[in-house]
Amino acid sequence: MPSLISQQWQERTSGFFSSSGTKLREAGQTAGSFVGEVAKDAKVNVADVAERVGSLFKSRWAILQQPATRHAVQEHLITAAATTGTFVRKGITETKEKVSVGKIKVEEAAKKTAQKSKTILTDIERWQKGVASSDVFGVAIEITVQRQESSRPIPLILVKCADYLILTGLNSPNLFKAEGDRKLIQQLVSAYNQDPRASIPEGVNPVDVAALLKYYLASLPTPLTTFELYNEIKDARSSIHRMRQSLQKLSNVNYNTLEFITALLLRVSQKSLLNKMDSHSLAMEMAPVIMWREDNRPESYREYWRRPSRSPKKSNDFETATPWDLLSDEGEGPDASSSIPLDDIARVDFGAVEVVQCLIEHHNAIFTDAAETVWR
């Protein structure tokens, strides 16, 4: 019995391996056939693609070889080259223009620097000799009048300013109150220091002329009313008779100049409906530059023709200033075209304001013995 079962298993095993080998050979043959077919198809596809690419290239090349196409391509290349050339030329032109503009700016800056240097050197030469013979700002009023050799004991600069205002500026709003242009007034100061007989250019704003007049009075070493008579004149402000007697103690130059200035202010106040400056408003603006104590001089005016000091100065520093002090540097501090401060409300001397208002309102009654001011 066992031998019969073993023989059956051997036969089945041999049959199984025999059939498996047959199936494997068949599968291998099938796979080989499939791979061969795939390779054949791939070969055909590659050849087909290559043929199509070659055909397309030949077609494009044939088109490019046609005269019309070749001409169009040439035109396109020429246009591209022309456009590129235009951009290059434009870039070169713009560069040249920028260089030219830069050169002009450099030349302008050099001219301004040279002119400023010339002005500084001129002032240095003048101040090396002490006070220049032509200076009017910062110089005692008696010396100025003596130099001008005029029969009229009034500084010419005041006469020219007043004449200009009478002719063109009485109706200007806020006259003697509105701020002036620093740069312009510095130019006028320089012009009058070099030529006291210079005329005010046409077209100058009356406000700037009024500021120039106001500044000249502030630049005087002593006020028109003098330090010695300050208290006496102040105490006389309530009496025309006492005021007249006190003013007669002034020197001839101070007396006539004070009469001249207050006569001008009277004319301005008569146009107050137009210029908004009545006698009180004018007195508020002009008192600080006409009448001040030794310890209360109008410092705000010093700041625009000399650099402000960082430390307190003695009262006589104004007369001994150097040209470096008198010439402000445009590159420092406020812009040169900024306005000039024309008052210091924190230090207003209301007694002096009342004196000047009295001199304006009662001018003709107080200055009875003065030569009548005649405007041209």
Curated annotation (Swiss-Prot):
Residues 307-338 are annotated as: Disordered. Keywords: GTPase activation, Phosphoprotein. CDD domains: RhoGAP (cd00159). GO terms for biological process: signal transduction. Gene3D superfamilies: Rho GTPase activation protein. The record marks K177 as: Arginine finger. The keyword Phosphoprotein applies. The modification Phosphoserine is found at S59. Residues 139-367 form the Rho-GAP domain. One of its GO terms (molecular function) is GTPase activator activity. PANTHER family: AUXIN-REGULATED PROTEIN-LIKE, OS07G0486500 PROTEIN. This is Uncharacterized Rho GTPase-activating protein At5g61530. It comes from Arabidopsis thaliana.
